[in-house]
């Protein structure tokens, strides 16, 4: 049995508390975000921009510290059974909601049952399928009360899993596993997220939300670690225009930008080198391909041709100014729990001119004459994405494919894709919720809202189902590698780049540490004078 207690992490937390405790005169931080959240109902969220907001408002059983290590949150300790199928959490008795109510085990049970209920329509429900009966509940085959999570008593919560899940603790840091204030949700329904109504249990509570302007939060005085939260007020400002965040950062109006304009990288490296943070990031930038019924894009040879002709080195080095790496797989390099030599597109090392010749041959084989195919390249508003799609349009000309650009508003962009919106080729990105290949490969399973191309492949789904219940981790890794091999052959989505995180962080901000998932909760930060 594996046992973790709060005392085991006390040294790490004490060091953080010491940093956070360096309170300065300035207690308000203004943080740039990629876009506004489409919702503050964490069961309906799906983007990184939304997760940043949720991480400040709520606290899960476990949380990620400044280095993104899993540390105690509402749970002060936990035990894992020898077979890896049972996780038992002991909740701290001083955890409280922002209205002073105690946080109890039933708050987690209520939330987890709600997210699995089909009527909730939670796009992230399937991320919790490792929990016993979760998938059956999400598909309507079983009742929410049958979910493998139990409030043993007010301060003890037990999970039962289908199979050993090496990333389960990391998964519990995700917004899909956060608790809910039952009384407020029951009384207010969908209005529970409104300022003045919303009750949260994290380091901060919601004060106001003005779309396209800012979200304002203030310290939750009932938070169990409030004494070590150094920043009293957080203002999250949306910046779909990354250059606007840069300008306001230089003016001293914003202390942190979560992304930066790649075309101004040389300027920032010269003038803001101490504030510019570029670090490895667990994410893939990719191009889902769909097309209308009868479109040549439905032919995998056409998709393969498009993928072959893309000069990923140029896009990474010139468009993104060496802040990205060329990507030839959906699962990013360096991920945990995978095979030693992961699958990759087999033309990664071929000369680009040779690839263009092969691409033209594939198009001819598919019956696509030169100049006969026009595709629309859609992307969410950002100069970085616009420049990427402009470069791709030029590359497609080399094999006789015409392309037009379609810029879409960012806040509802991914909702449009999740709801099955029509498109030819779009840009998308996926940042790992946990370090496991499953978190990238599940995106293309049948029935998953994140399967933007609505691609269906029975063999692929069967392999992913098999991996989910395979207890031998080596066998599990190979099964998922077999699934990715199918994915890379069919290319319903074209891997393009491997992410790096790019941020501007004021020298006044203390406690910020680069980490692979690029998670930076405000509670770990402080501001120097």
What are these regions (language model features)?
Residues 503-529:
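Long beta-strand-rich cores associated with HINT superfamily self-processing modules
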Residues 149-150, 316, 352, 402-414, ...:
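Extracytoplasmic/peripheral linker and loop segments enriched in polar/acidic and small residues
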Residues 140-146, 150, 154-155, 163-229, ...:
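Gly/Pro-rich hinge or "lid" segments in bacterial periplasmic/extracellular proteins
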Residues 77-124, 158, 248, 296-298:
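Aromatic- and charge-enriched surface segment that lines or borders ligand/interaction sites
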Residues 32-82, 197-200:
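N-terminal lobe/hinge region of extracytoplasmic solute-binding protein
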Residues 104-111, 154-160, 164, 202-203, ...:
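Alpha-helical secondary-structure segments
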Residues 189-195, 221-267, 282, 393, ...:
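Ligand-site clamp/hinge motif
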